[in-house]
Amino acid sequence: MVFVLCIVCALLLGCTFKDYKELLKDSGHGVCFSSKYGKAPFLMNVGIFGLMIVAYFNLAGAIDGRNVWTGMTFGIVFCMLATCNSGSHPGNVWPIMAGYMVTSFLFGGIFKLLGGESYGLTIGSQSILIGLCYANGLSPVVGKYGAFWGMLLAAAHYLLVTAVPDMHGGFCLYNGGFTAALICLLFVPQLERFCKTKEEKKAMKA
């Protein structure tokens, strides 16, 4: 309901589809949406991004056959929303969500093929939903290099986020964000060296 009200308020403030479409084209790198596009498109982003997160969590719960809504998951919804003025929007977050879901299905299937009985890192498990929240920090990279790399980096985050605590002994409470930073440290220099950004690809086609 809160997110629907955000959308209604954005429309009342004069936000148009064209305005929000411009925001969705933004890579999300080093940007403040409310300053660059205005308060109405930013508020529209809060509403649509919020509904997208809730829909994803409900889908994850339906797939797993469990109720995913706990105090922790309510908290991480708002944690994800905290980035919707500083770079995150549905256009650069959906590949991360898709990457998490595909990786969960893939490794869950491999686990069963190897004779495992209970795969603990399913898409609706709390640890994976929390991991997804902080994988959201990869969204500017997705916006800059495209959905394929977003899904690949999300898969790497999924695989590392539950293993990285062994590296720091549980002393880093911001583990998901630390994992996202570690992935950026490993992958972004390679992307900058060997891959073209979406803008560079468009310029080549023009």
Describe the function of each predicted region.
Residues 1-59, 122-123, 145-150, 159, ...:
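Signature of multi-pass transmembrane helix bundles
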Residues 14-23, 78-91, 139:
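C-terminal ends of transmembrane helices
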Residues 56-120, 124, 133:
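Conserved mixed alpha/beta catalytic, RNA-binding, or beta-rich assembly cores of soluble enzyme
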Residues 80, 101, 133-140, 155, ...:
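Transmembrane helix-bundle signature of multi-pass membrane transporters/permeases
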Residues 95-103, 149-159:
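Central hydrophobic cores of alpha-helical transmembrane segments
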Residues 106-110, 131-146:
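Short helix-perturbing small/polar motifs within transmembrane alpha-helices
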